[in-house]
């Protein structure tokens, strides 16, 4: 049984990028995060390393269970995200309706350690991200899972998200 209180989010550090890269290479993660292949994988690594500050609006975290690193998550202000060009994503199409900063935030998450899959941790991660976005003053949370990613969609729906369109799930929080 998972103890919800032992799950925490801590900012991703430079030394965590190797672990994140290892998780990206796992088939069950790669198929959802990198459906367009290696260019998309490299884009993920560029975003988490953020060498030139271009991705400062992306907030990256590692998910811990106690002291063990078990996953990754992020949130991003969609006002800035809609300007990002990334293969496989049309953020302008998704978030063109976002007209102000600090209103709508996109979230993403993964469980990198297989033994922690199917234990309800995704639901807890979404709740912890929601708490962070509320603390920022956000009003809406968005997620863009593939429609084939049934587990992720069920996690979002169980957290109060509603389907706006294929690959666009939203939750009003304030």
Question: What are the language-model segments listed below?
Answer:
Residues 133-145:
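Conserved GNAT acetyl-CoA-binding A-motif
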Residues 7-22:
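A short beta-loop-alpha structural element at the N-terminal edge
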Residues 118-132, 154, 158:
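Conserved acetyl-CoA-binding loop-helix of GNAT-fold acetyltransferases
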Residues 144, 157, 162-174:
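Conserved catalytic-core motifs of GNAT/GCN5-like acyltransferases
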